[in-house]
């Protein structure tokens, strides 16, 4: 993303009074436990418990959690205006009781937590013939995020420009900066006339999450950048707050086969009591925000916990732009297609909402939309693939401004009780409201009558 586009984003977000770009009074306040400070000029051998003795790295924080030094009730704060590489993919070793908080201290811009691996070593590349260059993604061949050895690359970023065309064999590479990643052998191959690392600031994302949330967790006032999987995933945990963060440059890694994925904030079925508020989310391969997932009705093996549904999940006052979709909902029974539980009081999605969010440019200027194999399912604000479980969800008070394809993608046969109303919808003249239906924005009254959606919403045609 160029500097000018970054400025445009900041200006647009600043126009929204509900969204806080730079925190000050909202910074992490010391909890009853210990506060740990992280700064670029810190020392991982220091105490870490004061601004004058900060630690330096994400890896130190992860190590301290696994060693039982950082426990529940503690607060971890990163210095504003500074950059830290790594990710918090596995916090399962966290001990104790109470809330764990990740936040910021000092003044200036939000601290940047980057998942990028930086490919700044030309000597690490090997030309394997023609314009094909290969690098082994092993220690010593890159800098930046060393928290993971994953080699499932999501996209390349060269001098702030996205390059997301991923091929599934080396032989398919034909054009500049197309790439193939071999996860098993940890090998990345890139089509380039010159050594890729000599062309500028080259970075890659790899699979994972910047934060895999745990129960009773607050993530606030951070700038989370660069991951091939999700920005934040909430799965089988409760009591999670995601507040006033910026989440960007997310997705593109392979989920299975040739299917790529990656969401800004994903609440997977089983996550409950979640608040996602006042965040800025942009440049995501798939969807900015979502509640989704399969039930687990029998435990064992890779299914250690029962999973019936999610409740009390709320997305509000977020600013979303340049994602393939803004909000997605789908829920289903077990993956083995056995009988779903639709009668339990905890089944499906209960008492959830998507309210007062400002969503614009769905699929417009979106790197993910440009490279996805199913573009008709992107470029929409609202997306629903399946509604096989009970859904109690309200989508109200939002602004949905401009989309590449349509306002929503939803199968007409779905009949769950989703309440969608009192929104502002702005599309281009002649643009469809729903991909699977014929009504255009000019025919919104007929569409609302047929679907039951947005009867009291405001529809405008973009000038």
Predicted features and spans:
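N-terminal export leaders
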Residues: 3-9, 107
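N-terminal export signals
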Residues: 7-27
């Amino acid at each position: 993303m160029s500097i000018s586009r970054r400025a445009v984003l900041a200006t647009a977000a600043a126009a929204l009074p509900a969204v806080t770009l730079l925190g000050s009074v909202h910074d992490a306040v010391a909890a009853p436990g210990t506060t740990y400070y992280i700064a670029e000029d810190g020392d991982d051998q220091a105490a870490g418990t004061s601004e004058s003795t900060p630690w330096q790295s994400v890896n130190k924080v992860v190590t301290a959690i696994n060693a039982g030094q950082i426990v529940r009730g503690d607060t971890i704060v990163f210095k504003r205006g500074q950059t830290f590489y790594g990710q918090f993919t596995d916090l399962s070793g966290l001990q104790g009781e109470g809330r764990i908080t990740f936040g910021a201290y000092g003044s200036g811009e939000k601290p940047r937590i980057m998942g990028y691996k930086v490919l700044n070593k030309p000597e690490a590349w090997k030309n394997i013939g023609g314009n094909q260059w290969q690098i082994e993604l092993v220690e010593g061949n890159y800098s930046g995020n060393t928290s993971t050895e994953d080699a499932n690359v999501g996209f390349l970023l060269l001098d702030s420009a996205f390059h997301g065309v991923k091929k599934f064999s080396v032989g398919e590479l034909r054009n500049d900066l197309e790439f193939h990643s071999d996860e098993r052998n940890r090998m990345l191959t890139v089509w380039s006339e010159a050594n890729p690392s000599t062309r500028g600031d080259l970075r890659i994302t790899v699979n994972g999450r910047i934060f895999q949330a745990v129960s009773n967790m607050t993530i606030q006032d951070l700038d989370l950048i660069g991951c091939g999987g999700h920005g934040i995933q909430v799965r089988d945990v409760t009591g999670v707050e995601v507040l006033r963060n910026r989440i960007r440059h997310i997705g593109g890694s392979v989920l299975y086969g040739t299917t790529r994925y990656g969401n800004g904030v994903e609440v997977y079925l089983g996550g409950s009591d979640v608040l996602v508020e006042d965040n800025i989310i942009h440049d995501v391969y798939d969807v900015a925000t979502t509640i989704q997932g399969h039930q687990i009705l029998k435990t064992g093996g890779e299914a250690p916990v029962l999973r019936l549904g999610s409740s009390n999940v709320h997305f509000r006052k977020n600013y979303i732009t340049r994602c393939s979709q803004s909000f997605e909902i789908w829920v289903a029974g077990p993956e083995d297609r056995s009988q779903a539980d639709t009668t339990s009081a905890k089944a499906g999605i209960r008492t959830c909402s998507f309210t007062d969010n400002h969503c614009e440019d769905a699929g417009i200027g979106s790197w993910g939309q440009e490279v996805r194999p199913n573009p008709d399912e992107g470029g929409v604000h609202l997306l629903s693939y399946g509604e096989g479980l009970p859904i109690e969800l309200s989508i109200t008070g939002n602004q949905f401004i401009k989309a590449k394809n349509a306002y929503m993608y939803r199968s007409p046969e779905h009949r769950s009780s989703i309440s969608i109303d009192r929104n502002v919808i702005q599309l281009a003249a002649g643009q469809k409201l729903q991909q699977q239906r014929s009504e255009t924005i000019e025919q919104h009254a007929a569409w609302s009558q047929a679907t039951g959606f947005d009867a009291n919403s405001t529809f405008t045609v973009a000038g």
